[in-house]
């Protein structure tokens, strides 16, 4: 019985060695034909962690889980009219430029306001802008920019405005069933691999439509078929909630609106988290406002009555004064922002890392000293 088991083990080992050799040969041929890295073992990947770029909003970075938009992925931002979709996308453009990257904006709606974009921090002199005549042209331009590998972010505003050429050439009232869905499906198949290879972030802004005759469930849907829903790694639902009233002379005027951004799909972190931000008219997302709210909840900024203080120093009476103080002191803003990101695990604590490095260095020194002492005794 023991001899039979041993023989079976030898046969298994022999065939196992042959299979491994065959696999190694196949991998070598694949690398020769398609380049190094075409096939690899998951554990051999140099970068396991998904690379991200900040969305330009602290609250949204936290809701996204990974600390921002994942690079090399497709993002869909949708919501009702005037909810802040383009504002959210323009903050991403400003952030990409801030990090030294190149951004492109495919303005299919022909409605981009350069002055508003500049107010949000976008360098309009460096922004690549295209206003295509048809959906195919817009997607082809986006594809060529992505294939170049030189663009870090491409925004398409919006999918609903990507009108197929056949529909433009036809008459109003002609039936063009499924044209846009087929166009988007083909575009997603072509673009997805290139987006991943070049690590470009592709943001598609989309509108909402109502399904006719829906009695139960959510009647809302997005144009362009289902392809974008499947290919998107992140989908954001942007909804404006309540108006923000001004103070003093503007107490009867609306100066902004509170907005909820729900992460309805997320392939890189847990989904269904919500970011609550203030979108101020002419300014965009109030970064100081969201920082004060989040830092106060974490007790990084202390609140006593109407006063806000940090490290025992008062920074303002009322949220508006505290916002102005942080806006006037960017170094303090960055310090508090860093502490919040460390608290949520979006960044490593540099002080703790430095302390750990010091401890490790001292441990290495002790090991060397012990080795030297042992050698002397010998």
Curated annotation (Swiss-Prot):
Keyword DNA damage: yes
Key word DNA repair present: yes
SMART domains linked to this entry: AAA
Pfam families given in the database record: RecA (PF00154), RecA_C (PF21096)
Cited CDD domains: RecA
Main location: cytoplasm
Location of this chain's protein in the cell: Cytoplasm
Domain of life: Bacteria
GO cellular component entries: cytosol
Residues involved in ATP binding: 79-86
Name of the protein: Protein RecA
Organism encoding this protein: Streptococcus equi subsp. equi (strain 4047)
């Amino acid at each position: 019985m023991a001899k039979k088991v041993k023989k079976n083990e030898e046969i298994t080992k022999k065939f196992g060695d042959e299979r491994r050799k065959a696999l190694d040969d196949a991998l070598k041929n694949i690398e020769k034909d398609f380049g190094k890295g075409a096939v690899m073992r998951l554990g051999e990947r140099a970068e396991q962690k998904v690379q991200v770029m900040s969305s330009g909003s602290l609250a949204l970075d936290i809701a996204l889980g990974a600390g921002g938009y994942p690079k090399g992925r497709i993002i869909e931002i949708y919501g009702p009219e005037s909810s802040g979709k383009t504002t959210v996308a323009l903050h991403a453009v400003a952030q990409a430029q801030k990090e030294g990257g190149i951004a492109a904006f495919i303005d299919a709606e022909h409605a981009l306001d350069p002055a508003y974009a500049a107010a949000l921090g976008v360098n309009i002199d460096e922004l690549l802008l295209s206003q295509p005549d048809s959906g195919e042209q817009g997607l082809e331009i986006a594809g060529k920019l992505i294939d170049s590998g030189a663009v870090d972010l491409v925004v398409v505003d919006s999918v609903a405005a990507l009108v197929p050429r056949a529909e433009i050439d036809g008459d109003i009232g002609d039936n063009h069933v499924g044209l846009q869905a087929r166009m988007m499906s083909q575009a997603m198949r072509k673009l997805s691999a290139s987006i991943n290879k070049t690590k470009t972030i592709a943001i598609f802004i989309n509108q909402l439509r109502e399904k006719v005759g829906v009695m139960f469930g959510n009647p809302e849907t997005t144009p362009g078929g289902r392809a974008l829903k499947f290919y998107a790694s992140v989908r954001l639902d942007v909804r404006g909630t309540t108006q923000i009233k001004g103070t003093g002379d503007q107490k009867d005027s609306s100066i902004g609106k509170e907005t909820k951004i729900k992460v309805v799909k997320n392939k890189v972190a847990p989904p269904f988290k919500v970011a609550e931000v203030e979108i101020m008219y002419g300014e965009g997302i109030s970064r100081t406002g969201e920082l004060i709210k989040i830092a106060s909840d974490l007790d990084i900024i202390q609140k006593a009555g109407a006063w806000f203080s940090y490290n025992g120093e008062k920074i303002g009476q009322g949220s508006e004064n505290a916002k102005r103080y942080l806006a006037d002191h960017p170094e303090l803003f960055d310090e508090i922002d860093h502490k919040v990101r460390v608290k949520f695990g979006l960044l490593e604590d540099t002080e703790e890392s430095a302390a750990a490095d010091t401890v490790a260095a001292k441990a290495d020194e002790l090991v060397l000293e012990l080795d030297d002492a042992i050698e002397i005794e010998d």
